[in-house]
Design a protein with these regions (language model features):
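Extreme N-terminal starter segment of soluble prokaryotic enzymes
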Residues: 1-4
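Walker A/P-loop NTP-binding active-site region of P-loop NTPases
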Residues: 6-68, 122, 131, 141-145, ...
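Hydrophobic "anchor" residues on beta-strands that sit immediately upstream
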Residues: 35, 126, 221, 352, ...
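Switch/connector loops and helix/strand junctions flanking conserved nucleotide-binding motifs
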Residues: 42-46, 73-77, 135-139, 202-203, ...
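Short, solvent-exposed amphipathic alpha-helical segments in soluble enzyme
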Residues: 51-52, 82, 207-213, 339-341, ...
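Phosphate/Mg2+-binding loops and adjacent switch elements
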Residues: 86-194, 198-207, 405-510, 520-523
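C-terminal lobe/tail of nucleotide-utilizing enzymes
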Residues: 180, 184-323, 496-505, 511-602
Length: 602
C-alpha cells in the first residue's frame, strides 16, 4: 500500500526544495518514490536541473518526478469526456458542449481528477506531493469532499453538473470518495508543513493546520526552514536576523512538540541531485555539512534604475492607475505592494487589495483587513477579496438577475444547483476583482496577487469569460441569460483593454536574485505577453549591501546575489530593475512599511 506525503506552506518557504529533499532521501533508503508538483508554477525542473513534464521521468535510483501541466491535463480530460458524446450528439449540440468545456471549471476539475488518480496508484511505495502555496493547497485538499457532495446532490436533482451529466461522472465520484478516505487515513497520509521563522509564515502554518484538521487530516510533520546560522553575535545583518528568528522558532516548537525538523540556511541555493541528497542528510540525519557555491568575487551591481523611473511607471496618466505585482511565492510581493501603496497614497486616493487566498496584507500592516475597504493610513484603504463572501454575493446576484428576467421556478432551481459547483468560486473572485477595478472612487489600485500560477489564472479569466458569453449570445435571444450579455461583455471588454493599456495599468514582477525566482518571473512575463500584457519593470528584493557582509556566510550570499543580479540584467533585457534592500528586521506595521517605502523611492 502506497504512502503519501503532502508539502504545504506559505509561498517561498522552500516547499519544493524540501519536497525534493524528502523524495531523494526516501528513495535513497530503497523506497520506490514518485515526486509530483501540483503547483501551476511548479519548478521541479529548475531544482533537478532537467526537463520535467506531465509524464514521470527518472532522475535517480528509485525516484521519478512529474509536473502537472494544467493545459495538457485539461485537454486530455476534455477529449476523454467528449469522446462518448460525439457518437450521440449532432454537430451543433456537440459544439455547444465543447464550448462549455472551455471554461475555468474544466481546468480545475481536470487537474484535480489527475491528482486523485495518483491517490489510487500503488506502483510506488511513496508519493510526495509538492503543492502550491497554502491557500491553494487547502483548496486542493478540500476538493475531494466538495466534488463528492456536489455530484451526490446533482444526482438527486437535475442529473446535470457543470462538467457534464451525473451518469457520465458517477465513477469519478467514487474515486473522489476514495481520495477523501486516503487523505484522512494517518497510516497512509502525512502533511509536512514547511515554515520560515517569520511572522506571516508562522501564522500561515498554524492556519493551515487548523483548516486541514477541519477536513479530518491530523498527521503532521513541521519543517522550520531557512534558519540563519548562529554567529554568536548580533553584529552584521544575518546576526540580527538570526536573533529575530529565535522567538518564532520557540513558538513553532511549542505548538509542534513532536515531529519537527530545523533546516539551516545554506550559503548557496539547492540545485542538482547531489546537493539535494546532501541537504537530506543535513535535515534528517543531522549531518554537519555545508552546501557551498562557486561564484567568483565581482564588483557590486550598478545597473539598478533610479527611483524617478519607478515613479514615472506608477503615476497615473488618466483618471486612475492600476498597479499589479506578481511573482513567485515568498519573494516579498505583499510587503512591496504595501510599500508602493503607501507612496501612491501621497498622490491620490489609493486602494490596496489582494486576490491571494492566504492574504497577508493585514499581518504586514498590523490592521484587520476584510472584504470591506478599511482605511489604514492617510489616503490609503485596504481590502481582501474574501472567497466565501465573493461566492455568496455572486450566487445571490445571478439568482436575483434570473428572477428579474422572468426565469421559471424550475429554471431557477436548476441554476441554483449549478451554482453549488466548486467552480463557482473562481469566477466569483474574478467578479469581485472586476468590480473593484471598475469603481471610479479610486485614483490608484495596487494589487497584491497570489503566487504566479494563480495570478496568471486570474488574468486569463476575463478572456475565457468573454468567450463563454459570446457563445451564450450565439444560442439566441430567447435565453434569459442573453438579456444581460451585452452589458457583461462590455464590462469584460473594458477590463481587458485597461489591463493591456500601459497608460492605465502597470505590471511589475517581484523576484530576488536567485535562479528560481528570476526564471519563474521570466516565465510569468512571457505568459502575460501571451494574453497581450507587457510587464514594465522588475523589483529585485532582499538586496545585500556589501558593507553589511562581514562573515563567511554573508560574503558567500553576497557573491551569489551579484551573479544573479547580472543574470537578471540579461534575462529582463528591456525592463527596468528596481532594488529593495534587505532589512535587519521584519517589515511589520505601518511605520516599518513607510521606512522601506522611503528606501525604495529615494
Amino acid at each position: 500500500m502506497a504512502q503519501y506525503i503532502f508539502f504545504s506552506g506559505k509561498g517561498g518557504v522552500g516547499k519544493t526544495t524540501m519536497a525534493a529533499t524528502t523524495a531523494v532521501y526516501q528513495s535513497g533508503k530503497g523506497k520506490r518514490t514518485l515526486l509530483v508538483s501540483t503547483d501551476p508554477a511548479g519548478n521541479l525542473g529548475d531544482i533537478f536541473e532537467r526537463e520535467v513534464g506531465v509524464e514521470p521521468v527518472n532522475v535517480s535510483t528509485n525516484l521519478t518526478v512529474a509536473q502537472m501541466d494544467s493545459d495538457a491535463i485539461t485537454e486530455a480530460y476534455k477529449n476523454r469526456m467528449l469522446e462518448p458524446l460525439s457518437a450521440i450528439l449532432d454537430e451543433f449540440a456537440l459544439a455547444q458542449v465543447k464550448e462549455e468545456f472551455n471554461g475555468g471549471c474544466t481546468v480545475e476539475i481536470a487537474t484535480f481528477d489527475k491528482f486523485t488518480d495518483f491517490l489510487g496508484d500503488n506502483t510506488y511505495d511513496l508519493i510526495v506531493f509538492d503543492t502550491a502555496p497554502t491557500g491553494h493547497t487547502l483548496r486542493l485538499m478540500t476538493l475531494p469532499n466538495e466534488w463528492d457532495k456536489y455530484i451526490k446532490k446533482s444526482s438527486e436533482g437535475s442529473g446535470q453538473t457543470c462538467i457534464g451529466p451525473v451518469s457520465q461522472i458517477e465513477g469519478a465520484r467514487k474515486k473522489y470518495e476514495h481520495a477523501v478516505q486516503v487523505m484522512q487515513d494517518a497510516s497512509q497520509t502525512k502533511v509536512f508543513l514547511v515554515s520560515r521563522p517569520e511572522k506571516t509564515s508562522v501564522y500561515e502554518t498554524f492556519r493551515a493546520r487548523t483548516e486541514l484538521e477541519k477536513t479530518g487530516i491530523h498527521n503532521f510533520h513541521l519543517i522550520i526552514n531557512g534558519v540563519y546560522p548562529n554567529h554568536g553575535t548580533t553584529s552584521g545583518i544575518f546576526g540580527k536576523l538570526a536573533e529575530n528568528q529565535k522567538a518564532y522558532i520557540n513558538e513553532l516548537r511549542s505548538k509542534f512538540p513532536v515531529d519537527t525538523s530545523e533546516v539551516p540556511m545554506q550559503q548557496s541555493e539547492i540545485k542538482g541531485v547531489n546537493n539535494i541528497a546532501l541537504l537530506g542528510d543535513i535535515t534528517f540525519e543531522k549531518k554537519m555539512a555545508k552546501i557551498q557555491n562557486n561564484f567568483a568575487q565581482s564588483k557590486p551591481f550598478q545597473e539598478f534604475a533610479p527611483a524617478s523611473a519607478l515613479m514615472d511607471l506608477l503615476v497615473k496618466k488618466g483618471n486612475s492607475r492600476i498597479v499589479i505585482l506578481t511573482g513567485k511565492g515568498g519573494v516579498g510581493k505583499t510587503v512591496t505592494a504595501c510599500s508602493v501603496a503607501i507612496k501612491l497614497a501621497e498622490k491620490g486616493k489609493t486602494l490596496l487589495f489582494t486576490t491571494d487566498p492566504a492574504a497577508h496584507i493585514g499581518q504586514v500592516l498590523e490592521t484587520e483587513v476584510n472584504h470591506i475597504p478599511v482605511q489604514v493610513n492617510e489616503n490609503l484603504w485596504a481590502v481582501n477579496i474574501d472567497q466565501k463572501e465573493a461566492v455568496e454575493e455572486y450566487r445571490q446576484k445571478i439568482l436575483n438577475d434570473a428572477k428579474a428576467n422572468g426565469y421559471t421556478a424550475e429554471l431557477i432551481a436548476a441554476l441554483a444547483e449549478e451554482l453549488e459547483s466548486p467552480c463557482t468560486e473562481e469566477i466569483a473572485i474574478f467578479e469581485q476583482f472586476a468590480n473593484l477595478l471598475n469603481n471610479p472612487e479610486w485614483d490608484y489600485f495596487v494589487l497584491d496577487t497570489a503566487p504566479t500560477g494563480h495570478t496568471l489564472r486570474l488574468l486569463e479569466l476575463p478572456f475565457e469569460y468573454k468567450n463563454q458569453i459570446d457563445m451564450k449570445a450565439k444560442e439566441g435571444a430567447n435565453t434569459a441569460v442573453n438579456a444581460n450579455t451585452g452589458l457583461v461583455n462590455t464590462k469584460i471588454e473594458n477590463l481587458i483593454n485597461r489591463l493591456k493599456n500601459t497608460d492605465e495599468a502597470a505590471f511589475l514582477l517581484v523576484a530576488y536574485p536567485e535562479f528560481t525566482p528570476l526564471h519563474e518571473g521570466f516565465r510569468a512575463m512571457k505568459d502575460l505577453e501571451r494574453v497581450g500584457i507587457n510587464a514594465q519593470g522588475v523589483f529585485l528584493n532582499n538586496i545585500l549591501d556589501e558593507k553589511d557582509c562581514t562573515d563567511d556566510f554573508s560574503k558567500e550570499r553576497w557573491k551569489l546575489q551579484q551573479h544573479y543580479l547580472n543574470q537578471a540584467k540579461e534575462i529582463y533585457r528591456s525592463k527596468a530593475l528596481f532594488a529593495i534592500p534587505l532589512q535587519s528586521s521584519e517589515i511589520i506595521g505601518i511605520k516599518q512599511v513607510k521606512v522601506l517605502s522611503g528606501l525604495i523611492f529615494n
